[in-house]
């Protein structure tokens, strides 16, 4: 229980959309930030439990306003990098085989290509109820000084309270 230490706002939503536009991506329609999807899904009662990492991610993202990706380290192939996806790059993001064009979007890449971003994560690296090793990316922006750090601190506290081991690796 308790009160959420962060709250989203129009300023947070605008800064996140600007982050997505950084490389030329257009965050409209079904390509909105995942944090905006969570607001609607929560209001509709459509957020089900997946696993501790994703459930905590959803709570922190919903209240803090920053999109968060969680991938299964046992389904991804190192090395990892964050970069802007080239035009024409896409991947399957759900079990139905739907694809997302990620060209111009800041994304997490593994050795096989892009696998996560602030809109939708790739199906090939998604977590499952049995996932035990995850990599989390909080898609923060320098326009929101301290918010990424605060979001991670809250995420860490919640996961550690559930018995998870958490380590940090910052990138810019």
Model region roles, listed by residue range:
Residues 1-172:
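Non-transmembrane, aqueous-exposed alpha-helical and coiled segments at domain scale
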């Amino acid at each position: 229980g308790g009160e959420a230490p962060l709250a989203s706002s129009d300023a947070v939503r605008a800064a996140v959309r600007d982050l997505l536009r950084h490389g030329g991506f257009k965050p409209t329609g079904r390509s909105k930030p995942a944090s905006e999807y969570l607001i609607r899904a929560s209001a509709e009662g459509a957020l089900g439990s997946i696993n501790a990492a994703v459930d905590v991610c959803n709570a922190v993202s919903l209240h803090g306003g920053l999109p968060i990706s969680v991938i299964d380290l046992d389904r991804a192939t190192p090395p990892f990098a964050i970069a802007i996806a080239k035009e024409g790059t896409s991947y399957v993001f759900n079990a139905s085989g739907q694809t997302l064009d990620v060209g111009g979007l800041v994304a997490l890449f593994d050795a096989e290509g892009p696998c996560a971003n602030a809109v939708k994560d790739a199906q090939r690296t998604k977590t499952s109820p049995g996932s035990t090793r995850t990599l989390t990316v909080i898609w923060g922006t320098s326009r929101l000084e301290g918010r990424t750090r605060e979001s991670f601190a809250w995420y860490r506290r919640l996961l550690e309270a559930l018995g998870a081991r958490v380590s940090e690796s910052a990138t810019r």
